[in-house]
Structure formats: structure tokens, C-alpha cells
């Protein structure tokens, strides 16, 4: 039977419950325990698919096509278990399910209430999400005291009563603010947070105390006394400069041992060799590159969380320090491409909406003309096709019908039909609801032999995750290929363009993909596409300034001649 670790948060949000849960899961996994993680989100949205990235951050896509919370990305990066749609659910999904049951008459005419119907549904969703795991870590979104979180907290309280004593463990993540005028960490917010948790019937077994400095022994004893938590279970969770140090930090304070003891699990000792090697590689780079990430959500970098992590993973495996420069594409529209001058590579990620599109196209044109390594992801591939069509094919005003429905050259259009991971035919139109209606999840991509993409992956076919509605218009593919663009990846049916590239005789590294490779990158293995991209950036950075300038001037001359 699965045992449960419930992770809650107090005082403020964004303390890092997801990282804490993932780090504990990583420790348990190194001890030979089968572990999974669930994220319970209290918001009423059915999923985050249509939420503003500035409010929610990144939408992480699972292999089975679920649009989920970004914490699931952390889970997959820290442990080997792949997440599914059952690893993340929201208040919206719970109420939707309960209302469907009420309409069917499942409650036999009874009055449907938060207790027991909503709480029972939450418990059912939790049990359905654990699969065959020995331990399921369940992260409750929000903070203790939020009205939205109360049904979830009540549900896990009930589970702790209904299950055997050693089958549940409660971990509470809280904040210890440092007051500089007093010169000390203040424990009162933590005391009140735990008091509120205990008032609803939950006694935490472990406290993770977030702070910017180590927790002094006296404060540790004080917290233990006032919260009814054993002193050794009050753990200092200090700020670190990279998240991959956290498993070792928690292991040093015996968090995994405390949890195993609480759950009555006998397991082998933790082996952190892999994590220590990752941290060592991060802290001892042999190279350094600057990457321009040109997007529209750059004011909230969590909008590109998996992408920034994938670049860091590639840096680990190429012994390279990655400096990511987040550049607002609207600034390029207003002030030009001068901000790209000292970059060693350019990346245009996915996105939605017309705002900032022309700035991204300008960045792509700069990368192509100056032979700077370029990686386009999702929208970044679509805009590369638009840029190439306008400037190489001379198709003036070529565009995507997403941004210009009346474009004379619709080089990208809405997908109307495709097959999902189960082989079912999906059909969409411009009038279809936005939520959950994209081409989502893992899709097979066939790689053409003798292309850079095939060389990078070393395989004939790969499975990568998608999240988009628009695709390259097949009518324009012959013109694109005739002008020198290589269509290096196709969908399993061979009718959708998945990858494009320029020949290396023309450009050293210009690759773009319709899918999101960042969703499958892990610190342990990296991702072949990102590793190759960083290698290309290292090579470009290694050129002398004179060589770079000559390369750029020659390419500009060639481009000007071809335009004439």
C-alpha cells in the first residue's frame, strides 16, 4: 500500500514547496524507493492552459498531453518517474467531476456539499494518481489560511485519520524572515502558521524553515517547543545558488531518514554521487557563453523555467557556464538588434499572440545573416519560416494566419486534424474552445537521414512533446526546400513539418523545431538538441573578434547580393 507525504506551505507563497518535494523524492529514489509526486492546485481553472504566463508562469506539458503546473517540470527533472495528467489536478477539475456525478444522479438525490462530496473526490483523485508508488509526495498549492486551500487540507486530514498511523507524514514549509534592525531571524510567523495548521487538525511532523541564513540552535529549539515538532525535525532550508544542491542540503540534516522513520520504511542508505557530480560540473565550468533568449514574457523568467533549466543541463554536460540574457522582443522592435551584438547564440521560444512577433523575426534574421547559432522552439520555428519566406523567397507580408488572417502568403496555418498519442483523430477549427484543444503531448517525429537533426539525435525517430495549434503550410514546403531550407523532421504520418534547418555550408548551426525539447531535459542526461546548441555556441564564442566580424561581414555581403 502507498504511503503519503503531504507538503504544505505557510506565511507566504512561492517558498519552493515544489523544489522541496522534488528534492525529498530524489533522496527517497536514491534509497531504492519507488516514488511519485502529485500537485494539488486550489484555483478554479480546470488547468493552467489558458492562464496568463505573467500570473502562473510556465505551463508544463506531460507526455500524455496534460497542461500542468510548472512544478511537474521540477518533479520530472529530479526523479525518473514521468508525470501524467493524474499527477496534477485543480479545484476546477474536482468541482467539474462532482457536478457531472450529481447530474448523473450518482448521489441519489442527496445534498451535495464540500464535506463529504468535495473532500471525497479530492481523496479519490489522490489515490488514482499514485499508481504503484511506494511513497507519494503530495504538494498542496497555496498557503495555510487561504480559503481556496481548505477543502484540500481537510481531505488530507481525513486521510491521515483513515490510514494507518505510519502511512502518512506531514511536512510544512515556512518562512523565517531576517530583520536586519534586530539582527535576528524571527520565528513568530512560523509559530502562527503551524498554529493555524493545527487548528484544522493537522500536526506537522517536519518543518522546513526557509531563510537566507542557517537556523541558529536557539531558534531551532524555540520553534520545536512552540510547534510541537521534534527538534531534529526542524530543518534549515537556506537559500542556495542552484537548486541541484538542495537534495544534499536536506540529506545532511537527515530529512530522508526522518521521513523513512516516520513512515516505518526500511531502505538502503542514500547515494548522492550523481547529484554531487552535477553540482561539481556546474561549479567548475571550462567554457562560458551568452545566450539571448528573445521572448515576450521575459519580465517573469518562470515563464521559461523548463527552457532555462534545459540550457543549464546542457551546460553541465558541456562543462559550460550559461549566461541567459532575457530580451524583450518589443525592445528589438523599438530599438533594433544592437542588444544581440555580443551574444554567442540566439534562442526564440514558444509563445502566443501577436505582440512582439516582429521583434522576434528581426532577431531570427540577425542570427541567420550573422551566422550566429540559432535555436527556434515552437513559435520560434514558425517565425523562422516566416523570416525565411520574406527575405529569401521574397514573399512580402508572408505570415501566419494566427497573426494575419488575410496574409497573401499564409506560410503557417491552423491544424485542423491530427492524431493524438493514442491514435485517435483530433479535429479543431478556429471556433473551437481554447482550453485543452491544442496538439498536445508526446508525438513521434521522423528524422531525415544526413541532416544535422539526425546527427544530433543519432536516431531515425524520436518522441517529443508538443503544445501548438498552428503548423507550416504544406503548400509552401517545396518553395522553402528549393530556396535552401531543409525540412529535417516530419510527423509520423509525414504530413506535418516538425523540424527545419539550414545547411551547415550556409550556416554553422540553425535549427528549429515545432515541439518543446525542454520538457524532456533532465540534469542527469541533458537533451541532445540543447547540448549540440551549446557546443555550437562554445565554438562561436571561441572565434576571435576579427574572425567573427569577418564572418558577419561576408554573410551580410552574400545576403545583400542574393537580395539584389
UniProtKB/Swiss-Prot annotation:
Membership in a protein family: Belongs to the CTP synthase family.
Activity regulation note: Allosterically activated by GTP, when glutamine is the substrate; GTP has no effect on the reaction when ammonia is the substrate. The allosteric effector GTP functions by stabilizing the protein conformation that binds the tetrahedral intermediate(s) formed during glutamine hydrolysis. Inhibited by the product CTP, via allosteric rather than competitive inhibition.
Binding site for L-glutamine: 351, 379-382, 402, 469
The protein's annotated pathway: Pyrimidine metabolism; CTP biosynthesis via de novo pathway; CTP from UDP: step 2/2
InterPro entries given in the database record: Class_I_gatase-like, CTP_synthase, CTP_synthase_N, GATASE, GATase1_CTP_Synthase, P-loop_NTPase
Binding site for Mg(2+): 71, 139
A GO molecular-function descriptor: metal ion binding
Keywords of the record: ATP-binding, Glutamine amidotransferase, Ligase, Magnesium, Metal-binding, Nucleotide-binding, Pyrimidine biosynthesis
Keyword Nuclease assigned: no
Binding positions for ATP per the UniProt entry: 14-19, 71
Keyword Metal-binding: yes
CDD domains: CTPS_N (cd03113), GATase1_CTP_Synthase (cd01746)
Catalytic function, reaction form: UTP + L-glutamine + ATP + H2O = CTP + L-glutamate + ADP + phosphate + 2 H(+); L-glutamine + H2O = L-glutamate + NH4(+); UTP + NH4(+) + ATP = CTP + ADP + phosphate + 2 H(+)
Name listed for the protein in its UniProt record: CTP synthase
One Gene Ontology term, aspect cellular component: cytosol
UniProt binding sites for UTP: 13, 186-191, 222
Positions of the UniProt region annotated as Amidoligase domain: 1-265
Domain of life: Bacteria
Location of the active site: 378, 516, 518
EC supergroup of this enzyme: ligase
EC id: 6.3.4.2
Domain Glutamine amidotransferase type-1: 290-543
Subunit structure: Homotetramer.
Binding annotation for CTP: 13, 146-148, 186-191, 222
Biological process, per Gene Ontology: 'de novo' CTP biosynthetic process; pyrimidine nucleobase biosynthetic process
Gene symbol of the encoding locus: pyrG
